[in-house]
Amino acid sequence: MKSRTINALLILNLLALTVVLVRPYGISPLTSAQTPPINDIPELARLMAEDQADRTPDDPKLIDWKIVGPRDAARLKRVKELYAQNKLKTGADYYHAAMILQHSDAADDFLLAHELCVAAISKGDARAKWLAAASEDRFLMNIGRPQRFATQFRCDSPNCEFHLYKVDETVTDELRKALDVPSLAEAKAREAKMQRKNK
């Protein structure tokens, strides 16, 4: 009887020790079985596909902004609703939402797009790296500061001659490369090509 009691106590102590060792590290042998897989939101993927389709006709001159503008506003409204409801969970969700937000015209939306890209990258979605740089550049451009990654071009002249928006040239090409952004020299070469094409 005494032997059985000792064995029972040993088993209880081992179980208690397992709990003490496991809990501080947030590990549980049942976690993987209890946690259902998190799926991307199909609606966000569809909204981003529509956003891109509106911007990529065979001839860019065929984009009718009187039609695309209201569509953008509706997509933006829906993305903000999903974000406010804490529906975004996966890297793809954050990336899709950021892509739509960065087509806003408000600095706060560009900043949120950048933050969503950071979240997407942290969840393993490398597609968001370039967009993280571009959304930061859009934010800076919108508040009148030089962009950092040379992703943004503007056309200010009457004949809409594109030029690279002013760039903070202290940012290194290595950092640009880490975010899947072309070098500053490549951005300037693209600017020259766009200007030649416009003549």
Question: Where in the sequence are the language-model features?
Answer:
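Short coil/turn linking the two alpha-helices of tandem helical-hairpin repeats
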Residues: 98, 102-106, 140
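TPR/TPR-like (Sel1-like) alpha-helical repeat modules
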Residues: 110-126, 153-157
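N-terminal alpha-helical interaction modules that lie
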Residues: 26-91, 123, 142-155, 161-169, ...
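Positively charged n-region of N-terminal signal peptides that target proteins for export
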Residues: 1-4
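Boundary/linker segments of alpha-helical solenoid repeat arrays
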Residues: 123-135
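Hydrophobic membrane-insertion alpha-helices, especially the h-region
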Residues: 9-21
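Short coil/turn connectors between adjacent alpha-helices in alpha-solenoid helical repeat scaffolds
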Residues: 64-68, 105-111
